[in-house]
A protein has these predicted regions:
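Electrostatic cytochrome c docking/interface patches
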Residues: 2-25, 118
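Short glycine/threonine-rich turn/loop motifs
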Residues: 19, 43-64
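Soluble non-cytosolic domains of exported or imported proteins
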Residues: 20, 24, 39, 68, ...
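A generic structural signal for secondary-structure junctions
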Residues: 38, 49-53, 83-86
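Short Fe-S-cluster ligation motifs
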Residues: 58-79
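C-terminal capping alpha-helices of c-type cytochrome domains
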Residues: 74-119
Length: 119
């Protein structure tokens, strides 16, 4: 039994979302359009967790569909968004997705570290 418990604990630790891995994925996959602190092709992400979709300060490039979606960026909605933005909000403008659930969890863990808006 102890070996099974150790194996389960190791698997759980390996599967736990990792903000450092998420930051690396974010830098590789997201920074062509996004930044934590500056709007670009896409909106800045600092403070995204818990924010209403389509409301990042100073960003004017949102689709009408996203602005009207009523979504609040929580773990479940971010996961669905990153997996397939068009299915979640038809008519939105984001052109990429992350198919791997582990990568999505890591990116979401990283986004949570950007909780406070930079003033």
């Amino acid at each position: 039994m102890d070996n099974n418990f150790a194996l389960l604990a190791a698997q759980a630790a390996a599967a736990a979302p990792d903000p450092a891995r998420g930051q690396a994925i974010y830098q590789a996959r997201c920074t062509a359009c996004h930044s934590p602190d500056f709007n670009g092709v896409g909106p800045a992400h600092r403070g995204v967790f818990g924010r209403l979709a389509g409301t990042a300060k100073g960003y004017a490039g949102y689709s009408a569909a996203l602005k009207k979606s009523g979504l609040r960026w929580n773990e479940a909605n971010l996961d669905r968004w990153l997996a397939d933005p068009e299915t979640l909000v038809p008519g939105q403008a984001m052109g990429i997705s992350l198919a791997d659930a582990g990568e999505r969890a890591d990116v979401i863990a990283f986004l949570k570290t950007l909780a406070n808006a930079k003033d």
